């Protein structure tokens, strides 16, 4: 049974009903409808913390989805789950793939920066200042990309860039 039919939350049910109506009204291909259904079910599972089910739905959504913009959000959400699971290498891969398809996704750049910054901090704790500097430089580049797209956001990142003298 599609997840949209088992949600107990009134808002989720209402959103699912509206989405189903829109899918019937708006001219879309069967592949687009299938991809959206999997994506919607993935978001529902993810919001409930059912990451394995969410991943399964997102992976299924990538098969029929050909639109690069829509696909970027699927890949971004896969990256979010891998981040939550502590699988940072996989997360970076999916954020990167999302940005390849949609370079105007500042949240993906921000999340990549956060992971790089975290790895830089780990390297500092391990006493490897050269690796730490490399990771921190990479974090700075990703944060600059995110800030360029949404200048009013990521204030903490902007402050970090200024403090570390990486802001141009």
Curated annotation (Swiss-Prot):
Subcellular location, principal: plastid
Entries under SMART domains matching the protein: TPR
Subcellular location: Plastid, Chloroplast thylakoid membrane
Cellular component GO terms, alphabetical: chloroplast thylakoid membrane
Pfam families per record: TPR_1
Keyword Iron belongs to the record: no
UniProt repeat feature TPR, residue ranges: 35-68, 72-105, 120-153
Annotated keywords: Chloroplast, Membrane, Photosynthesis, Plastid, Repeat, Thylakoid, TPR repeat
Membrane topology category: Peripheral membrane protein
Gene Ontology biological process terms, A to Z: photosystem I assembly
NCBIfam families per UniProt: PRK02603.1
Physiological role: Essential for the assembly of the photosystem I (PSI) complex. May act as a chaperone-like factor to guide the assembly of the PSI subunits.
Family the entry assigns: Belongs to the Ycf3 family.
Entry protein name: Photosystem I assembly protein Ycf3
Organism from which the protein derives: Amborella trichopoda
Taxonomic lineage: Eukaryota, Viridiplantae, Streptophyta, Embryophyta, Tracheophyta
């Amino acid at each position: 049974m599609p997840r949209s039919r088992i949600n107990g939350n009134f808002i989720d049910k209402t959103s699912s009903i509206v989405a189903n109506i829109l899918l019937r009204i708006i001219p879309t291909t069967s592949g687009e409808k299938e991809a959206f259904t999997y994506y919607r079910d993935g978001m529902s599972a993810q919001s409930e913390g059912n990451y394995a089910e969410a991943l399964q739905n997102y992976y299924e959504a990538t098969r029929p989805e050909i639109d690069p913009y829509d696909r970027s959000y699927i890949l971004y959400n896969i990256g979010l789950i891998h981040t939550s699971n502590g699988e940072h290498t996989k997360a970076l891969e999916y954020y990167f793939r999302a940005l390849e398809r949609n370079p105007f996704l500042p949240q993906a750049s921000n999340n990549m920066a956060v992971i790089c910054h975290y790895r830089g901090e780990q390297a500092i704790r391990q006493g490897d200042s050269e690796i730490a500097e490399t990771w921190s430089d990479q974090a700075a580049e990703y944060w600059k990309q995110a800030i360029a797209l949404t200048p009013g956001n990521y204030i903490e990142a902007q402050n970090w860039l200024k403090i570390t003298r990486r802001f141009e």
